[in-house]
Amino acid sequence: MASYFPPNGVISSHGSTRASSPASSPLSPPVHQRSNALSNRLTSVLSASYADSDIRDALETLSLRGIHNTAEVRRQLRLDVQKEVVDSNAEIVRDFGLVAEQLKRIGTVITNLNQTCDEMRKHIVSARQETTPVLEEASALMKQRKEAETKQELLEAFTQHFIVPDEDLLILTHAEEPIDDHFFEILARVKQVYRDCEALLGGENERLGLELMEKSSRSLNSAYQKLYRWIQKEFRSLNLEDPRISSSIRRVLRVLAERPSLFHSCLDFFAEARDYVLSDAFHYALTDAVSGTTGDTNVKPIEFSAHDPLRYIGDMLAWVHSTTVSEREALEALFEVSFDGQKALSDLVNRDLIGVSRALRQRVELVIQGHDDPVTCYKVVNLLSFYQTTFSKLLGPQSNLAELLETLEKFTFKHFETLMHDEVNNISTDHSALTPPADLSAPQFLQDALEVLTSLMKTHEASYGADPIPTPGPKTTSSSPPPKDTNSENKFTPVLHSALEPFLDLAKSSAADLPSHTTQTIYLTNIHLTVRTTITPYPFASTTHLSPIQTALSTLRTDLLDIQYRYLLTSSGLQTLLAALEPFSPQQPTSTDQQKPKPNISDILTLPAFQPQALINISQQLDDFLPSALMDATDNLKRVASATFVKSVTEDAVEAFCRDFEFVEGMVIAADNEARGVDVGEKAVEEGGEDEEGVEKGGLRRLFPRTTGEIRVLLS
């Protein structure tokens, strides 16, 4: 590639020719200045960055043109480039001239096309003006033809639809004609005509619509009266137990349902007949054989189990439920649930069972009033609740049977509450029953009540399951106590209000007869432990009543802990030392105590309890107490029913005792250190005597050698 710079010889020769001329001039700069300018020029050229994209593109263009780096080329380069630019611009001008000529020719063609379009548009407008009258006349003729055809079709359809032949009307209204499928087809057609006549009333000819509607109405009334007389005749010989009920009866009932007055008259007649039949059947099941001479002679009447209320009531409810289901199934087959839906069908079943419901209520109330076992009463409550739910689903919650069973459930539960209330009153007047036992265990009447409560909870669990049911159970009466926690009550909570709380209150009130606080606390603890043990396995009982029991036990445990703690202090003799060291206790002082000076540790040596003989006696008492301390402390609460509870209380009391002993030990060591001048300065005990000389020789520690570690080991 040719160099963009001239050869060295050329540059030097050129420089020499140029240099000779100025050298002879007196105005030329010195030689060293010219050489500096040349070096600066070369430096600026050589320092230029040829990595620049513009310079690189320019050099690449020059290289493609095949230009040699000569002085002539460098002089002509600008002129050549400008000449090429001028030539290119001239070429572009020529090309645009050709484009302008083409555009002129296109404009001429477009002008010609516009002229042609204008001529065609004129021809179209003139043709439209000539054909418009013809088209309008043809359209009017076609419209008239269509209207005539429509009127003809309408007349044919009207005659065929609204006019019923006289022979068909005779079949519909005449009493001697049979009620068959043809009768119902004619009836359906007449009803359709009557409904469609309403459309005629809104048209131009109202008179025609009124006449047709009046004629159809007379025919329909006669047909419905014919159906009513026929169904009355059929009801007299109808047997619901017969599975082959006539389909015509079902069809007639569906049709009569369109006339409520006639239909309800039929239902009234039917309900009265069924009420009489079912009442007689219920009385027959109670007192006589189940199915007469053709029945099973091994099946006894329900009255035979009247001595057992639960079985007696259960058998009656089972019979009523079976009869209700059978009656409903028979009525569903008879009416096909199409006349007024499920509600009307349930109402009809209710009316059929009015007499049965009356007899059932009388017998249940008599049985409950003559029975005094609360567990059996509660079982009857659950039985009634079960059947109440069953009949609510079967006949609806507003049905007579569902409301009757709800009333009987409330009545039975009220009788249950009365029995429990009477039992509480009997116990409250029996002073021997309220006397706490010698072993301070739960009183017998409470244990008996808890046995009854256990039976009640098992019954509830068998009926509803172990989980609490949030829906409220039978409403409590005025004789029952108000609920303690209405937010967490469940279906069993009213039972606890009657069967647990009064007996628990009686048991707690009987503790006042005990002579000491310790025996009262143990007695109350045993009562609450027994109740807690009874209700804990049953979530529906513990949900509402375990928390108050636990709170009371927590308070009683604190009292027992204090009793056990005082017993340890008194038996060990440590109480004497603690009482003497009370002024040295690190407790927060009151406002009056802040004015008093804090006693000095050295004053301990002057306390009567810390004199050598007294301290020796206390130490000996402690040594005698420690070997059997834990056993004696446990035996102190032996009448508490729960060994685990006693162990927990004793351990906490021992821990408190050890903390107090640690405090006494620390004060003894501090007093010895004070006496020897350790940790307190140079102060010494000046009050002398024979005893104090002995103390100074061995210190209080020698007279009271036990350590906290030894105490913890011996009491562990």
From Swiss-Prot:
Keywords carried by this UniProt record: Golgi apparatus, Membrane, Protein transport, Transport
Signal peptide positions on this chain: none
Protein transport as UniProt keyword: yes
UniProt region (Disordered), positions on chain: 1-35, 463-491
Pfam families in the record: COG6_C (PF20653), COG6_N (PF06419)
GO cellular component: Golgi membrane; Golgi transport complex
Segments of skewed composition (Low complexity): 12-26
Record keyword Membrane present: yes
GO biological process: intra-Golgi vesicle-mediated transport; protein transport
Subcellular location, record wording: Golgi apparatus membrane
Function according to Swiss-Prot or TrEMBL: Acts as a component of the peripheral membrane COG complex that is involved in intra-Golgi protein trafficking. COG is located at the cis-Golgi, and regulates tethering of retrograde intra-Golgi vesicles and possibly a number of other membrane trafficking events.
Organism name: Aspergillus niger (strain ATCC MYA-4892 / CBS 513.88 / FGSC A1513)
Coarse class of the protein's main subcellular location: Golgi
Protein name: Conserved oligomeric Golgi complex subunit 6
InterPro entries named in the record: COG6, COG6_C, COG6_N
Membrane disposition: Peripheral membrane protein
Stated family: Belongs to the COG6 family.
